[in-house]
Structures are given as C-alpha cells and as structure tokens.
Amino acid sequence: MRRLLACLLAGVAGAAAAQNTNEPQVQGGKSDWEIEQERLNWREVDVRPPPYPKDETLIEFRVSSDTRFRFFVDPASLTSGPDGVVRFTLVARSPSGYANVTYEGLRCVAKETKVYALGGEGRWTARESAWRLIEPRSFQRWHNELYAWYFCPNRMPIETAAEGVEALRRGGHPAVLIDMQNRR
C-alpha cells in the first residue's frame, strides 16, 4: 500500500512539474512566445529627429562616479513608439562645457541601442547606424543606465513619454526601484 501511495504521489508531482514548465512565462503582460514572435516580425517605424534640445529643459541622470561627464535627456524628445523603441535626445556634457548631442533609440526587448542623428550647432545630421547590443560594462554605460533604470523596466518599454520623464525625475523607474527594495 505504501509503495502504491508513493508511486501515486511521485506521478502527481511529476505531472505538476511538467505542467508548470509548459506554462508560458509572462513579462509585462506578454508571454515569452509573444515576445519572441514580436522580435522575429519586428519592423522599425520611420524616424525623424525631434526639434533640437533646449538646455533649460534637460533632465540630468546619473551614470557612474567613474565619469566626469554629466548626462541629460531632453524630455520633449522622449517617445515610446509602436515598434517598441524608446527614442530620446541625449546630451553628454564634458567638464569644460562641450556638449555631445545625439538622437538615440533603445529597443528594450532585444536590449539594443541605435544612434539616429548627431547634433551640433543647433541642427541634426542623420546617421545610418545598426542596432548594437547594450553592454553593461562598456565605455558607453549611459545606454545600460537608461535601459535598466529608466526606460526599459523588466525588459519592456515604457508605455508613455510621461512615464519616462517621471522615472528620470525620480532617479529610476518605480518598477525597478521597488524591485531593488524587495531584494534587500
């Protein structure tokens, strides 16, 4: 009788384990399968640079104590497109005051970045560039900071520009900040 009961329990446990592994994993309301299908069928929308940024409206965000540059996003340029790309104007200011201005995109699901245009003297120069993987420890750490802390919580793009602006003002997206608090 005990052997029969042990076999039954083992069978039920095995069936339950098999059932759990077949359930789709869900991120941001989408299953892994849905995310993979979107990645395979993805098409980028046509992109044009926004109006040139104004210094007085820029929002600063922290990158690292290792850099002497200061980094800013123009809130007026921030968009979350129907193609799942968060686009924004980035300003990197050197200690001497020189500004590197770029119009960029983050593809959250793929963890990739792309530069659409370079800025200078109040105007944009379009740039043909490919999507590149965001490397957490690369020289260009600001991409990882914007990806991980502000615009791509849980690998999903922000839903609205206002959500991204609020994340910049708070020092991080609420979903990320809450997750960090729960890990402590």
Predicted regions and their residues:
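N-terminal secretory-pathway/extracellular module detecting exported/lumenal segments
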Residues: 19-103, 107-184
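N-terminal signal peptide c-region/cleavage motif recognized by signal peptidases
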Residues: 13-15
